[in-house]
Amino acid sequence: MKKKLSKLTALLLSLTLALSIVPVWADSPSVSVYLDGHFLSHTDARPYILNDRTMVPIYQLAQALGCDVGWDGATKTVTLTRAGDTVKMVIDDPTAYVNGKPVAMDVAPTIMEDRTMIPAAYVAAFFGQKVEWDGETRRVYITEDKSVAEGSNLEAWALPMGSMLAQLDHGKPDCFGLYARSVAGIGLSNKLPYAECRKILSSSWSIKNRDDLIGTVISMTFSGHNDNFRGMAADVKLRSQAEREAISAASSVWPLYMWEYTEYVDEKWGDRGILCWDLFRMSNLVQWGYTAGYITYEEALALIEPAATLLCENFSSWEEAYENYLDGYNWWARNDVLGKDIWQTSRGKTYQTIKQNYGSIFQDSLFETGVIPLPGLSVEDVIATLPS
């Protein structure tokens, strides 16, 4: 957050100069806000210019960024929280409090036609976004400030790792975060991206907040289902065919043992087990967590680094890694595909579709280059933010 505040003054000064010739809302044409290159729709109130600042409905921008929004009617205080950071603003007060520290703004939040309007540039910058103004088109462009990852290739690792579930869950395999943050709705649920990601994390993973997410990601990276597989594979080696048949005959869940397939996968991959089944889903958790507003972009990449390193150390191409993933998925799902072409299974075909449509994200050269970490944040730094 200190880095964000240090950049804020210069950024907002440049925007002030750019907007200085723009009239106020009552006398000016409409203003459009774009997030990650896509129009940010407004349903209840349109953006306008106030004191050379673009004012937007609070929910329009805050929810797109994955913020939780709180309102204290008694004090007229708006509270925005995202990824461990908190911003408080009071209606008609030009001082914001960012993690408790006062920051002077040259325009205050206001209420217009029963809608709380906030200064887009300040709020976006408080949460690590880059803001640009195009005076000719009267557009505000907000994007993730990815300069924090300058020189790192962790996003290039993350995209192919998370591409399978991005494809299956109506997302975008070539978009970090799996969904475009500005889209109106996702799939059949028609939920906003941040809400859809929170739903997935909660219903499928029992992850309801930042701490849950970070803890689960760390656990999955270094243990996960691969530990279960390797334990079962070791057990298979100790049992004779007669013992296997006796156990199966006495059990009502005999298909779950999958003796032959477990043995086959173990012999095929050795100590690697079903490593990619865990690592690839971990990338999904991290990207969902980013879009949900639980972690920042920089934190998401830091959390991916250990998984990307394990992947790079154990595999030499994306096709090899995805073959391991497919074996892991079918073992976990108890799909006995022994003797079948793994690439003709449902997810095998999905992988081929992804490669056909998003082939540029599958760069085998990464396995030669290796993992290039972030310049200013490590996974240990992220873990240190958890309660002791």
Question: What are the roles of these predicted feature ranges?
Answer:
Residues 2-150:
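Primary recognition of N-terminal secretory signal peptides and signal-anchoring hydrophobic helices
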Residues 147-297, 301-388:
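Polar/charged low-complexity regulatory segments
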